Each structure stands twice: as C-alpha cells, then as structure tokens.
Amino acid sequence: MIFNYVFSNSFSFLYLMVNVQCRIKEIMYWNICLYWDVFSKLIIYNKVCQFGRIHIFHGKNRHQLLRTCHFTPSKRHSAMSFFEALGAGICAGLAVDLSLFPIDTLKTRLQAKGGFVKNGGFHGVYRGLGSILVGSAPGASLFFTTYENMKSRLSQSGLGLSDPQIHMCSASLGEIAACIVRVPTEVIKQRAQASGGTLSSRNILQTILKSNNVWRDFYAGYGITIAREIPFTLIQFPIWEHLKLKWRIKHSRNKNLAHEAAISGSIAGGIAAALTTPFDVVKTRIMTSQQRLSYVFTIKSIVAHEGFLALYKGIVPRVLWLSGGGAIFLGCYDVILNFMKAEGL
C-alpha cells in the first residue's frame, strides 16, 4: 500500500517540469504540500520499531555488542523515528546529487553509445540536474525510511539473522522501493546527459509524454537498475555498517563521529562501485536508447562490437563518484540522524 501510493504520485513530480508557467515559489509550495501528504500516509501504514542503545562491554566480552531492541507502542515515538530517517534521507540525497552531478554526467557520456566526445564531452555537465532534484528527496527518503524500518522489524522477527544479513535484506528492500521514484528521473537525466547538451530535462519529458508507451519509456531499464542496485547495496551497506562498528568498538563508543561515517561510506561505495560497473554500463545503454532493448541483447552487442572490457567503461569516474558520494551520502545521513536523535527533533 505504501508503494502503490508513492507510485501513483511519483509522476506528479515529473509533470511539474512541463509547466513552464510555474514559478519557483509555486513549485516549492506544491512540493511541500505533496511531500507532507505522502509522508503522513506513510506514517499511517508503518509501525516503526525503535532500537535501544548499544552497550559496550569491557573485560572478557570487551568486543561484544549487545543490541537491545524493543517495540515502541507510542504513536508519537513511531512518528519521531520515521521523521528522523526521513529528514536525514532528504538532506543526504540532495547533498550528494548537487555536489557530484558533473562526475556522474562524465561517467554517463563515457558509457553511452557513440563515445565521450560525441555525447557532449565536457560541455553542459549539469544537463539533467532538474529531473534529479525533483526525484532526489522522495527517492532518498523512501530508501532510508524503508531501510531503518526493516532493520527494526527483522531484528525483532526471531529469525536469527546476523547483522550483515539484516543489513543486506533491509537495503535491498529499500532500493526496490526507492527505484519506483528514482528510475523515471534517471531515464530523463541520462538522456539529457547523453544528448550533447542539446536537450533539456523538460524537452525529454515532453517527448516521453507524447510517446505511445509512456510507462515503458519512463521505466526503461527498471529491471537492470534493480539488478545493479541490489548487488551494489548487498556489498555497500554491510561494509559500511561493519566499518562503523569497528570504529565504535575501537573507541568504546555507542555512536560514530562524522569523519568515521564518511570514511566508512567512501570505502564501501568505492568497492561496490567497481564490482557493479558492468550492470551500470548495460543500464546506461538501455536508458539512453530510443529503442526497446533487452538486457541479454545489450550485453551480447557490447561484447561483440566493443569487447568485454567495454563493460567496464566509466569505471574510474564511477568509483570516484560513488566513493565521494558514499562519503557525502552516508556520512551526511549518519551525522544528521544522530543530531536529530540528540536534539529530539
């Protein structure tokens, strides 16, 4: 029910970009109202579990962590828990997209068919930014609210799952939820990036809306995006959580400092980025193509015409982008989440 509601409203965000007569104040007011409507309904359908404090033991069991979990029956506490993940997710998503967008553009142009120069080179590196800003906040917030909620639920499930298994499952479900909003904005962004600076996000959106297969075009590459994001999160989040845990054990603390969360996020993001580059190349080819391509055909075509190493095109900017992105995104999320908990916001 949560996903159905967000799915039905995600294209309202995209439609904003078509209305040329909208002013900035009107857009901001409209977004705030819609965000509140979405989030208030999410709260109704989510009973959030809240982690207790992490206790550090000394002596014989010095390196053993006991995570005491409990359900919080209070609706007020559940809403606070939800809004902590929500607020931190929004800030983290906007921070990483605004700061590292040019690197993402260069990576897309390297991977797109035709090569770097033909697709625009260094010209217009902020093409497609508008679509990402529209989808960034709802996508990131949907991911982290799902991630934190599922961590609590799985810890209380009695299934005997280890921490890495809990992090993997929670992150995977978070990605599936976030991609409902993220994929349409990603399609518009990558087509704008690969246009050589000749098309804006609005132009591409108008073209898609006029096509005979609007839904298919908006969700071109949804399957391969999930196939890329789930392995990425299966690698990134367990590494991130494990490295943060090592910092806490080393310094006998129950929370991480800002630089610890950022460094852990950077390492985890870089490793995951390198290992999942082939998925990203295939996704880029499918999303930037004007024709409907299958995953298998795209992979065979790349290997046959460009060689196996073509599946690793753009690996350097991708690793740089996601290493920096991991530091900003996960570091920012962790710091803001701790701040909101400390201040009771």
From Swiss-Prot:
Keywords from the named record: Membrane, Mitochondrion, Mitochondrion inner membrane, Repeat, Transmembrane, Transmembrane helix, Transport
Entries under PROSITE patterns matching the protein: SOLCAR (PS50920)
Compartment list: Mitochondrion inner membrane
Membrane topology category: Multi-pass membrane protein
Residues in Solcar repeats: 80-153, 162-246, 256-339
InterPro entries according to UniProt: Mitochondrial_sb/sol_carrier, Mt_carrier_dom_sf
Ranges annotated as spanning the membrane: 83-103, 128-148, 220-240, 262-282, 296-316, 319-339
Pfam families in UniProt: Mito_carr
GO biological process: mitochondrial S-adenosyl-L-methionine transmembrane transport
GO molecular function, one term: S-adenosyl-L-methionine transmembrane transporter activity
Any Gene Ontology CC annotation: mitochondrial inner membrane
Main location as per UniProt: mitochondrion
Matching SUPFAM superfamilies: Mitochondrial carrier
Family in the record: Belongs to the mitochondrial carrier (TC 2.A.29) family.
Protein name: Uncharacterized mitochondrial carrier C12B10.09
